[in-house]
Amino acid sequence: MANAKGKVTQIIGAVVDVQFDDALPEILNALETENNGKRLVLEVAQHLGENTVRTIAMDATEGLVRGAVVTDTGGPISVPVGAATLGRILNVIGEPVDEKGPVNATETRAIHQPAPSFDEQSTSSDILVTGIKVIDLLAPYSKGGKIGLFGGAGVGKTVLIMELINNIAKVHSGYSVFAGVGERTREGNDLYHEMIESNVIKLENLEESQVALVYGQMNEPPGARARVALTGLTLAEQFRDQSGTDVLFFVDNIFRFTQAGSEVSALLGRIPSAVGYQPTLATDMGAMQERITSTKAGSITSIQAVYVPADDLTDPAPATTFAHLDATTVLSRAISELGIYPAVDPLDSSSRILDPQVVGEEHYQVARDVQGILQRYKSLQDIIAILGMDELSEEDKLTVARARKIQRFLSQPFDVAKVFTGSDGVQVPLEDTISSFKAVVAGEYDHLPEGAFYMVGGIDEVIAKAERMAAEAA
């Protein structure tokens, strides 16, 4: 019941117990109280009996005291949605945190929504071209699909996400929503300023911006980190339903969503499951992931960075995420150590739509040929390490030479990484990617040195670089 009043009876970190006199608020209702002169939102998680509810705080609870008055809002957390949120940074409860004044939205939506029903969903499969060779060729993204970027710490997940926002926001006229979940505040700040520089956010006229940002970073309490992905998703759903276009929804990092859930789970008195995660891990993940889908109105394509604890893909958090994905882009430390960026593992990454019926026979065949050569090279590496290259047959030597060229050709300079590489980013059209790799596999460029294939765009750049290298050597 809206406006029912209660009192705080117990505070344990991010978990607050509230006792009501008569009407109990429903599960997932938002309650409000004041703490240090600021509005503090609590979300009901459990009914404990004796008219007491256990809630999760969406902000710090330092300074909150027993006996503080709490009001039931009568519904779930609601956030502003629509064009007014473009170019803005919001927090989990929809308040602006960018010091640009209030968000003058005409509509608000509850962050907890049911997933679209079967008859509302769309079933077509189309490729979403990113301009990044290794992704478009070997693990293509589908429109309205869910894509996971897997990788340990520091192998380039956030850089790849920023490049995708950069490429797709420019090529696509659609909107993007970026949810920063439990990641570094510095990265969130960098991303915001880079978006201003690249005109994705237009400060003079915010409503012409292409992106809305929702942040719940590492320093936030677990309640905020466990809900901020839902806040971002609610914004994306409204853009999809209102504009009927492809909306891009970026989550960095989906692991932190699970981690925040596990932090509050023990405080809520649940018995932990494998590796200390919450027993409701699969349920929490499913409730969010099932909302990310294509409907008849439009699509939400979601790209989610997945931190892999200790590089262990069998950990319950990444393993549960795998089940929901249409494509996986696995970033490998071994490849980043070779200096090949993006450090995408061409053999571990996969996509549901790498299928001749979706991408076409030629694309499928070239991708499989490239993977075949790289797989053969991988299996020969032990022999090379022990006996050296000279012990290989002529055919294997040729395979190794081509594989090393392919490996380098899968690297690419990024716009957003210009400060590291010193060279301008390139986007390669899908047709060029397919024809270039087809020619390399067929041996048409066996005469070029492997260094010419490193950090370039299309095959024309390889030829130009090889000529430059020959001129310098002479």
UniProtKB/Swiss-Prot annotation:
Main subcellular localisation: membrane
SUPFAM superfamilies reported in the protein's UniProt record: C-terminal domain of alpha and beta subunits of F1 ATP synthase (SSF47917), N-terminal domain of alpha and beta subunits of F1 ATP synthase (SSF50615), P-loop containing nucleoside triphosphate hydrolases (SSF52540)
EC nos: 7.1.2.2
Catalyzed reaction equations: ATP + H2O + 4 H(+)(in) = ADP + phosphate + 5 H(+)(out)
Keyword Nucleotide-binding: yes
Family matches, as CDD domains: ATP-synt_F1_beta_C (cd18110), ATP-synt_F1_beta_N (cd18115), F1-ATPase_beta_CD (cd01133)
Name under which the protein is recorded: ATP synthase subunit beta
The organism of origin for this protein: Ruegeria pomeroyi (strain ATCC 700808 / DSM 15171 / DSS-3) (Silicibacter pomeroyi)
